[in-house]
């Protein structure tokens, strides 16, 4: 499934529990690297609650931020994965 998500040309939204979110990001980073795809990940954690957090960047960067957050294992995660847009230069 991760390979399909990493290779998708469309945004994918995933809802993950606190127990699976870190592993999901690790597997996504590996799949994107394997496919040679650049993806952007946006993570929203604990929406509308006290410890609400947002992260955005490459899977590796977001994973590092989530792992460094002392509240990272609280609540649910909404993860949006989309292909990185290539900027055309003229």
Identify the residue ranges that each predicted region occupies.
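Class I SAM-dependent methyltransferase SAM-binding "motif I" and its flanking Rossmann-like core
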Residues: 1-8
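A contiguous loop/helix-start segment that scaffolds small-molecule binding in enzyme catalytic cores
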Residues: 10-90
């Amino acid at each position: 499934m991760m390979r399909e998500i990493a290779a998708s040309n469309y945004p994918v939204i995933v809802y993950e529990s606190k127990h699976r979110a870190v592993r999901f990001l690790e597997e996504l980073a590996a799949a994107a690297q394997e496919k040679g795809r650049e993806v952007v990940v946006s993570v929203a954690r604990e929406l509308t609650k006290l410890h609400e957090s947002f992260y955005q960047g490459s899977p590796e960067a977001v994973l590092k931020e989530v792992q460094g957050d002392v509240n990272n294992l609280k609540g649910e995660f909404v993860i949006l994965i989309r292909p990185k847009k290539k900027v055309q230069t003229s």
